[in-house]
């Protein structure tokens, strides 16, 4: 499973990139989505690589985001009690493990697929450079560090 965070805005963006960001449901800066690992999403990430940070996510990271930023329709918070009501899982942790394994999806239970994050504490290292150049754009070996800064 990949975690993708939009870091750059829409000004002077090519239409193909804007459309791809829209298909990924990344309409605003600092929004995050989790997508499964397949060639379709990999191609979409390749198109928008200069506008997003992305990396492999695990169940621990998804659990943290669901607890902190998980929302249902009506902007209700996601808690263990709510998870017990809307799904066969007993906790957010079990739900996150099932989603990472591919046994369930957030959409099945009415959980909003987009997570609205804060700007990172202590700031970005730069949104015009890739990770290799000392910035934030592109593939992160540990995307969890960036997401924890943006929690």
From Swiss-Prot:
Keyword Ribonucleoprotein among record annotations: yes
Subunit structure comment from the entry: Part of the 50S ribosomal subunit.
GO cellular component: cytosolic large ribosomal subunit
Signal peptide positions (record): none
Keyword Ribonucleoprotein attributed: yes
Family annotation (PANTHER family): 60S RIBOSOMAL PROTEIN L7, LARGE RIBOSOMAL SUBUNIT PROTEIN UL30
HAMAP family: Ribosomal_uL30_A
Protein family (similarity comment): Belongs to the universal ribosomal protein uL30 family.
GO annotation, biological process: maturation of LSU-rRNA from tricistronic rRNA transcript (SSU-rRNA, 5.8S rRNA, LSU-rRNA); translation
Gene this chain is encoded by: rpl30
Lineage: Archaea, Methanobacteriati, Methanobacteriota, Stenosarchaea group, Methanomicrobia
CDD domains reported for this sequence: Ribosomal_L7_archeal_euk (cd01657)
GO molecular function: RNA binding; structural constituent of ribosome
Keyword set, alphabetical order: Ribonucleoprotein, Ribosomal protein
NCBIfam families: PRK06049.1, uL30_arch
Pfam families: Ribosomal_L30 (PF00327)
Protein name: Large ribosomal subunit protein uL30
